[in-house]
Amino acid sequence: MIPRSCLRVRTLLTALILALFLTWTLSRWHLKAYILKSTGLSSHSPTDLTPSHHKFWQEFHSLLERHAPNTPPIVEYEKAKTASFSAHDPPLRPDTIYVPEDEIAIMKEAHTGFVNAITKSPPDLPYITGTKGIVSTAGGFYLPVLVISLRMLRRTGSTLPMEVFLADEQEYEPYICDTVLPSLNARCVVLSRILIAAPAKIHKYQFKPFAMLFSSFEEILFLDADAFPLNKPEHLFTTDPFLSTGLLTWPDFWASSASPIFYQIADLPPPPMDLRQSTESGEILLSKSSHTRSLLLATYYNYHGPSHYYPLLSQGAAGEGDKETFITAATAMHEPFYQVSEPICALGHPIPGGMAGSAMAQFDPVHDYTLTSRGVWRVKGDNAPAPAVFFIHANYPKFNPATIFEDHAVNPVFTDEGEYTRAWTIPEHVVQAYNARGDVEKGFWEEVLWTACELEDKFESWGGYQGVCEGVRDYWGVVFGSD
């Protein structure tokens, strides 16, 4: 028999442990509530669409397989040269891929069958009517980069919810997904929990359209993990050109390199090479209610991308992947879209003989549309003030605090002499224009510093790194300490 005194001690210890647990739980809840209140955000807890997504994916996966281009993969071909876009002196459309006529006919039949199926009776795509939000993909090395971009988004005052798609359970980091992201009105979505309904081999570079498909939002702004806006993006949803089209994209540096064979398969006339630039898909605005079919066809191109449609749409030129699939799909489905005409701008710092370019500036679509709707095309040489910079896509190398100070092919934070430098100082007129609202790069590094120091021991991908916070503090002190 246990003495009564021991029973009393055990009861008291149990009560104490329970009280401590409740206090810890309440403190976490109050901390999260305080963060949300202080930032003006509300926690994003949408209706669970997983059962509906399972049903949709089973039906849609069957459709993707039924209309697969059942021909050998396109793997052996001369890579097309990457040609810059010119509205005045466009290059010829490259034609480097050879596909036998009988295989073209098979692919055309499959493409036509898929288009007819989604035209007549598309699968019911689940989303919450009337919602708007931001969608991204991350995980592993990209998760710290995403947090920095998300904090830059919140600096604009935007309260749009965000859904961050991860590949699988291994990429789900509990502290980041359960504490950090919810405090910024964002949540993690594990893609494999949806795709398990009809298992398929989908690689990370194919994830973008799947994240867009399975987001809960009706209208989405997709942003790559390393892209962020300089202004609140809310108004983009409620003004032209998005309001009148339902699909908005931004340009890349290059001319189109889509193969003439693709246009045979899609039964479309090849567009003139001076019509528009190729697409830089780090930023996409899309309405599912108006462009479900375009999104379904873009997903078809990506699902069969590595074997067929990536080569057909780029022929191995720079950036081959999902970038050309979105407006190509809209064209094939005869659905409207608007691609910003203002040329993309490389940002960097000077080095002997050129620039260490580590980011890209994309411009305000509303300003751009105001010009083009009046017949003013700066890309064709018309004289007009430039639209404002709206997005910065800090794409190469990734500004991950754990690795940014390592040696890279492009070194954004070092001069050729090995001294610390600002990353984005040229073109001066572009940098001066967007800095009129405040020092953008300094603000960016404030978020890099916060992420490095507040979350140094939180990211699983940083487990093997030492001195992440210290490295960023050193850089900050030299470059911004006297500002």
Annotate each predicted stretch with a short phrase.
Residues 2-483:
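Glycosyltransferase catalytic domains, chiefly GT-A lineage
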